[in-house]
Amino acid sequence: AIVTKPKPEALPFWTESLDKVIADVASKTTDDANKILIDNKPEDAMPLLIKLAAKKQGDERNAIIARFLLTAEHTATSGDLMYLLLRDADELTTDDYIRQRIIVALGYTHCPQAISYLRKYYGNKAYADALAVATTELIAYQPEANAGRMVSAMLYAAKQSYIHHYDEKDVDTRIDQVLAAIDNWHAEGGYNMAHTEVTRMEKRGFWVIHDQLADFNLAFDWLSEGTLTLSIRSMPVLMFNKEKGLKLVGDSKWHKYDTIGDWSTANISVNGDNITVSVNGQKLIDGTKLVATESGDPINKQGYIKFLADEQGATVREYCFLRK
């Protein structure tokens, strides 16, 4: 009789052992961090943990960031807010295991800003596996971002990573996912990430990005104590203010949004003459008609994007756009 050997039990996917390391580091959390978790809902505790971590050093800081990562798994915080918190955590940690866990978590934020931010870890061996998981997840949820040379390189690197882990659980599903993404990739299109660097505007400073845009998606983070005005199609359209909220230029109503730290992040979509805006994951303007500020003027059909700071100055980062 032919004896068929039982198929060996698949090893757990590598992230499981990473999770154990993170849980172990988190178990050494200091009393002041534990008190934050006892006194606050998880959503409210997360930014407080990041603030506390910034005041600590070495192992104490890493323990708090690890605890933050475990807490983040059990909250309904929007992907955009989570992206901002994870970036702060990434800037604070020096630990490779924690950074891998942050990179994986950034994949599950499903925002274009995260794709732009994570490019800096491409080609770094220590983070190749984490970046594979993040890239696959980000592109699966944003097929419109699946274009351009950088995304292609990240997808091929993800495929290589999964091949190295071929004997682990559910890797075939991940490989199928990444192969499908590679099949659906386009050379042209996707998010233009040529202007993602941190750009500081001093008092009443401005930044014009000269690409002529008609219909598009736009994402960026900003930091300002005052009001930041955004021109779209070469016309002032939106005003952002941390205290008051967001409003359309020429409108009196401010739309409040939640903040969790110094930075906020926006996603804007313009289709025809209608605009939709989300800030920190909250949709505040939904398909509202663009109106030319000088009454009676027709709306520009295309134009540049311009950021204008007030007396307080402003900083913008991770500016990326997708033409439609």
Predicted regions and their residues:
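Beta-propeller blade termini and top-face loops
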Residues: 71, 124-128, 133-137, 244-245, ...
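Mid-chain, structured segments of secreted extracytoplasmic proteins
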Residues: 59-77, 142-145, 193, 221-224, ...
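Carbohydrate-interacting regions of secretory-pathway proteins
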Residues: 173, 180-324
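Helix-loop junctions that connect tandem helical modules in alpha-solenoid scaffolds
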Residues: 24, 92, 161-165
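Disulfide-bonded cysteine-rich modules in secreted/extracellular proteins
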Residues: 17-25, 191-196
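Structural detector for internal amphipathic alpha-helices that build alpha-solenoid repeat scaffolds
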Residues: 1-12, 20, 29-42, 51-54, ...
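Buried hydrophobic core positions in alpha-solenoid tandem helical repeats
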Residues: 14-22, 48-50, 81-89, 117-119, ...
